[in-house]
Amino acid sequence: MITLTHVLGSDIPHHNLTVLRFFNDVLAKCLPVEQVRHFMVAAKETAPFSSFPQLDINTYSDKKALAEAVIARAQADRSARFFWHGQFNATLWLALLSGKIKPGQVYWHVWGADLYEDAKSLKFRLFYLLRRIAQGRGGHVFATRGDLIHYQQRHPRVPASLLYFPTRMDPALTAINIDKPLAGPMTILVGNSGDTTNRHIEALKAIHQQFGPDVRVIIPMGYPANNEAYIEQVRQAGLALFSQDNLRILTEQIPFDDYLNILRECDLGYFIFNRQQGIGTLCLLTQFGVPFVLSRKNPFWQDLAEQHIPVFFYGDTLDEPMIREAQRQLAGLDKQAIAFFNPNYIEGWKQALALAAGEHP
C-alpha cells in the first residue's frame, strides 16, 4: 500500500490543529495507518502536537524549511505521494511548476485563499500567474462544489472531487433547535477573523444603514497575530456608528465552547469576503439556526443552495422580518442531512484518501 504524506505547509495554528485533531481522533480509528499517520507541518509552536499520539508529525520552523524537505523527499522517491491540506507555500507551487515535484505526487485539498487571487501588487500578480499554471498540474484536486466550479473553469482536465474541510462540530447539537428572542435588538456576527478580507468596515457601514445603530455587533478578530493596527481601525469605524455597549470586538482567541455560546446568541451573520472562506463558522451558525449574508462572489453559496440552506446576498434588500423568516426555515431544515456537517463529511475523506493512496481509480 502507498504511504501518503500529509502536508500542512504554512503555520496556521487554528486550521492545522483542526485537521490534526480530525485525523487523530476520527480517521486513525477507521482507515489504514499508511493513509492517515504521516504529517509534515510548518509550525513554530509544537507543544499542542503532543495531543495527537496516533500521528507521526515532522515539524519545520518555517515554510521554506518544510518546502525543502518535501522537495527532497519527492525527488528521492518518485512513488511518494503528498496530500496538500490547503497550500499557501509558494516554494511548493514553484517546485510543482518546475518539475521538482511531479504531478502524480500531489493531491490538493483547496482551502480557499490558496485558489483565489486577492492581492493586487505586481509581485503577487506575477506569482498568481505561475501558481495558476502549477495548479493545473496536480494529480487530483478536492474542494467545495463552488470552488470546484471555479477551478474547473481554468483546469477542466484535472481530476477533481467534492470534499469538505473537517469543521469541528458536535453532532449532538445539530438536532437541537434554539429559540430566538423576537423582542429586543438583534445581534449580528461580522466576519470570521481579523483578516482584512472580511471587509469589516464596509460591513459595519452596511449594517448601520440597513438596521440602524441599535443592533449589537460582535466581531471576532483573535487571529491573525500582530494585527493591532487594523483592529484599531475597525474599532474606531465601529464606534462612529454604534455605541460602545453595542460593539464587541474579540481580540483574543477564545475557547471553542465559549465561541459556540457567542454564536448561539446571534440572529444573523455578516460575511462579505469575495471568496470562499469561513466555512467552519458558517456551519456552526447553520447548526444553531442563524442565517447569514454572503457576497455573491463567494462560490460557497452554491454548496448552500445544494443543501437547501437559505442565504442572503450582500447588497440585496434586507430587514428583520426577512431574517426571522430565514430563522424559521432553518429551524425546519433537516440539518442532519447536510453534506458538509459532521459526521457526514467523514465518508468523503475516506474516499479521498483511498483515491490518493491508489486504492481505487
Curated annotation (Swiss-Prot):
Oxidoreductase as UniProt keyword: no
Transmembrane segments: none
Localization, UniProt: Cell inner membrane
GO biological process: enterobacterial common antigen biosynthetic process; fucosylation
InterPro entries: WecF
Gene Ontology cellular component list: plasma membrane
A UniProt-annotated Pfam family: Glyco_transf_56
UniProt membrane topology term: Peripheral membrane protein
Catalytic activity: beta-D-ManNAcA-(1->4)-alpha-D-GlcNAc-di-trans,octa-cis-undecaprenyl diphosphate + dTDP-4-acetamido-4,6-dideoxy-alpha-D-galactose = alpha-D-FucNAc4-(1->4)-beta-D-ManNAcA-(1->4)-D-GlcNAc-undecaprenyl diphosphate + dTDP + H(+)
E.C. designation(s): 2.4.1.325
UniProt record similarity statement: Belongs to the glycosyltransferase 56 family.
Chain's role: Catalyzes the synthesis of Und-PP-GlcNAc-ManNAcA-Fuc4NAc (Lipid III), the third lipid-linked intermediate involved in ECA synthesis.
UniProt-recorded name of the protein: TDP-N-acetylfucosamine:lipid II N-acetylfucosaminyltransferase
Gene transcribed to yield this protein: wecF
